[in-house]
């Protein structure tokens, strides 16, 4: 019998800063060469399991260990971080925290330098992975100057050059555009096969991970393993959404159309679904009876961009250039496109964080006449990296800070902060220190700190990246509620389903230029725009094509309307 490369035996772990154990009586075996998806809600213990696999527990994170955890045959309690470095390579959720080199090229080469590789061999390997990941043009740039998605790709390259027997990916898709996400999964799959490496992927985006075959899905909830099954077996259950993890969209659509999934053997990919006239007829009938409604909009101009641009440096490959559009009162807009296309740069110019070419006006007032503070009273901005926004030690104080700076009375502050904490799923942690939170939980705190101020326009940079399905739904439902009240919401996102379900208008960017201003459905059914902006077709569209439905666009719209009609009418008053 093959010895497992990873084994947990009655393993529990309690951080010194916590009263209760984060992991409780874990029993798990992972064999050499397996590719595993580790999923679960935020705070479930997924990342803690990962920190056991790379030696951060117990070498860095101190706490109480019970039972055993063996990695490559060695007990983690008696293995140094140095020894772990030869066994487990990790891509962290926060890419900034693992950069070493002054340039992208130096950072990718760091592991090779430590392995004393010859200089010509290092250049060859770095160029190989830079070409594979399409980051050759970034090799001379500083990692800190890159967009969030570009940083994640560079971190991926830095891990892949080392060819360790265990590859641990903590939310590898969180900041990647859809096309890059699919490319990343294909690369991980290729490397795993070539090296027979053991791959563990910690990720909320289950559907994207399943674009490549996965051996097993392990679900963690409240510190325990609630499922450990082959992919198809797990997808036939309802365990994913029961614990707050989003199920693949095409499976939800099949279920909505009353298709019996238990009669289908392989459901992990659309291409493996049986082409059946019975299923096609059910989907077509469901589409035909669907009620499709369109929201009437008054289109009152609010924010106008006139030939707006910005260039960080002369060496920047694709500076933001000549963007002209009008944002209307009550719009719910998604800004999408390839990593480094200028999405975040545009929003920073709107907020006044960086200078801009051209003219930006809000209700006919030139924003260049306002200070950043004055702009902030009208335009709220939630950054992609929560660590760049947080300034207080306690969660409640961080969310209350903006209200206190505006001299709001403490009774009103408590009422507003408590309401926002509940909406963002943070109320149980209201007395916690920020330092005890996961990266995803910190992100929720920064969103709450802006939402509580109720500005006219709210701009959110990847608000749902790294969030579980329950939190995703709570945040987006709240934003939708604000939008129905007349708030204008702008979201930078790589989530195509978010764009379809929640936003009514999409701005697509590629290489610093605005290439499309249209509806989400029209954008995601235009193959030329999909390719140029590094997007991907929704699995709803692919499902409709797989079953030869006469109007795939109508099927997509029918399902989006179906989900919207099933939203709960939450009381936010």
Swiss-Prot record:
GO cellular component terms given for this protein: ATP-binding cassette (ABC) transporter complex
CDD domains, A to Z: ABC_cobalt_CbiO_domain1
EC number: 7.-.-.-
Pfam family, one: DUF3744
Keywords assigned by UniProt, alphabetized: ATP-binding, Cell membrane, Membrane, Nucleotide-binding, Repeat, Translocase, Transport
Domain ABC transporter: 6-247, 303-536
Residues that bind ATP 2: 337-344
Nucleotidyltransferase recorded as keyword: no
Membrane topology: Peripheral membrane protein
PROSITE patterns recorded: ABC_TRANSPORTER_1, ABC_TRANSPORTER_2
GO function term, MF aspect, one: ATPase-coupled transmembrane transporter activity
Compartments reported by the entry: Cell membrane
InterPro entries xref list: AAA+_ATPase, ABC_Co_transporter, ABC_transporter-like_ATP-bd, ABC_transporter-like_CS, ABC_transpr_CbiO/EcfA_su, ECF_ABC_transporter_ATP-bd, P-loop_NTPase
Residues annotated as binding ATP 1: 40-47
Protein family membership: Belongs to the ABC transporter superfamily.
Record function comment: Probably part of an ABC transporter complex. Responsible for energy coupling to the transport system.
Protein name (Swiss-Prot/TrEMBL): Putative ABC transporter ATP-binding protein LJ_1704
